[in-house]
Amino acid sequence: ISANVLNMTAMTITTKYQRAQLRINLDNELTKWLTLSTKINASRTHSHNGGIDIMNFLNYSPTMEMKDPVTGVYNMDPYNSVNGNPYGARVANYGDSYVYALNTNMDLTFKIMKGLTLSVQGAANYSHVPSYSFTSSLAKPGQLSGMENASRMNLFWQNTNNVTYNTSFGDHHLTATAVFEVVPKAEI
């Protein structure tokens, strides 16, 4: 069992990143004929104003007037860039994105008789990725204020069943396996 928590303020202004994660790996011999193996990974991440356009930052004139003193709108660079003011984009706009994820796997292995096993495996992957953003009319000249909300969810699961027979006779070894697998198409 392990866990980690990360809470950091990034190198750029108004940027923050948080992550919490829990991982569990358990292998248990429940009886002489049954083994249970479980793997679980759960996490949550949050990014506030993540991602920057580094080329836009590097191309902007370092000595230009940042804001129009009358309107409060962040000025465009008149010489080096056709993009909006990167500083204005950082301080006037707002964005949050999250990732909630759960990955699980379980295996029940039945020892039916000497050399014969049945493995019943199940796995599921779930993710939910909501994001929210606000674009301010102060970020650059002519910019309209706007908001955006988005959400994406995925759920995938799988069931795999293996029957395996292992035996040796003389100088020979035989392994025979039969597999049945179900992988549905999931849309959320």
Task: Describe each PLM feature range.
Residues 109, 113-114:
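Long hydrophobic segments that form regular secondary structure
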